[in-house]
Amino acid sequence: MADSCADTVDGEIKGFSEGQQLNITKNEDLEQTKPQKEAIANTEESSACVSQIKQDLAPCKDPPTTTTASLEDDAKATSSASVTSKSQDESEVINSQSYTPSQSEATPSFSMASLEFSEENNGVPPDGPLSSAKSARDGNQVSVQENEGAVAGAMRPAEPTMPAYYFVKWITWKEKKTAVITQSENGPCPLIAIMNILLLRWKVKFPAQTEVVTTEELMAHLGECVLSIKPREKAEGMELNFQQNMSDAMAVLPKLSTGLDVNVRFTGVSDFEYTPECIVFDLLDIPLYHGWLVDPQSPEVVSAVGKLSYNQLVEKIIEFKHSTDSSQVSEGLIAEQFLESTATQLSYHGLCELNTTAKEGELSVFFRNNHFSTMIKHKGHLYLLVTDQGFLQEESVVWESLHNVEGDGNFCDSDFRLCHPSQKPSAAAAQPSTQQQQQMQIDQDYLVAMSLQQEQGEAPGPLSDLELARQLQQEEYQQPQTQQQQQQQPSAGQMRGQATSPQGGQRRREKKEETDCCIL
């Protein structure tokens, strides 16, 4: 290999070796990088750099495919410079190939194809990519990680929600097999309540033997019902209003699968703050009721609540509680007490108004405790459709009575007759053990003893009651034993008479004295 020396011509450093040409091109636009260019243009440092390269290439017989240099001095001089690659036409190196650094190299290395040194945001070609001033190895690792993250983010969209399935319960409704959708713990109750009304009206029908249904299927059936509605009046203004309502309803339908935001007013069972969600109920002719009303016999509460909605009342309570006016503070406390006393979102006055407002045989949606239920009025009584998934196999359990605010109604079948959920006790439960029987008998005897003492006018005491109960229990257990002894020993009756009659004891002592006598 012939030795060659690097020459400096007009700011260009050219080094020649066998089959290798190094070309460091000066950028005409780099006016602010004179310190770096002067450092690179230093003849002694450049000569040392090229000589080091030749020494590295000397052992190679074939033209090397890569060229490296440990430009420690240059790296110190250009530590603040950023390395940017030019386009392929400007950065082509004669008879050279790209260099990929190995991980074992400890010194910073980079490709010698074409280098441009520039300060931050200066001298960067408008179409050239921006690269780091660190080693190519570090830069490659960073870029690979960033690319992997970008690809992973692009290929990992928002996780699709799995379609929800709901079990279908078949009941006999007005002598017809009718499907009812059951609800899990966190199911979309507005959608289920509306769809159950459409099923009970036979507006929607499922194929026979259907066991599960998806949310998409429910939404499709509901959309068909909404689109099949026709305007009741042919007036031009009414048609335009109907078309607008249809458009709003179709936009609201997806919300039914996640829940509706309704804002009740405490003035009537049908009073809700108007929201686009209410349009669906209006179009499908489904009444929406609630029973959260203020008792008119409480004028202070009526004055504090007024005609406000729930959200407005909460804001009023917060504002009045921090007021400096004592009357406002008192009014806020009264309103807060009303919400606390009706935490079940149902008052007795509201229940009475609900029973009066609902029509006989009318299917409606009842809102309570942030839950939507299917309700019907039958012979003057209100019933809620049982949609709990736990009663899926209980075909006879269809309705639950709504007659108090506590929510402990009675279960009824499809004909509104009282029924009880079937319970299949186990064999152990069907046959209680002897210990359980004894405990039950003791409890029964204790109650009998209590009643006897009350009849005699004695004050019951815990100790005497317990003793009396034990005595009764003991006598009851001794009865079969005494009967057996009477059959085996006829004199057993006399021994029992000794414990109860003093005369019997006297007669027995007389007999004993007679037996002690002996005849000579």
UniProtKB/Swiss-Prot annotation:
Its EC number is 3.4.19.12. GO terms for biological process: proteolysis. GO terms for molecular function: cysteine-type carboxypeptidase activity; cysteine-type deubiquitinase activity; K48-linked deubiquitinase activity; K48-linked polyubiquitin modification-dependent protein binding. Keywords: Hydrolase, Protease, Thiol protease, Ubl conjugation pathway. The active site is at residues 189, 371. Residues 26-37, 511-520 have a biased composition (Basic and acidic residues). It is an enzyme of class 3 (hydrolase). It holds the Pfam family MINDY_DUB. Residues 43-54, 93-112, 132-146 have a biased composition (Polar residues). Hydrolase that can specifically remove 'Lys-48'-linked conjugated ubiquitin from proteins. May play a regulatory role at the level of protein turnover. This is Ubiquitin carboxyl-terminal hydrolase MINDY-1. It comes from Danio rerio (Zebrafish).
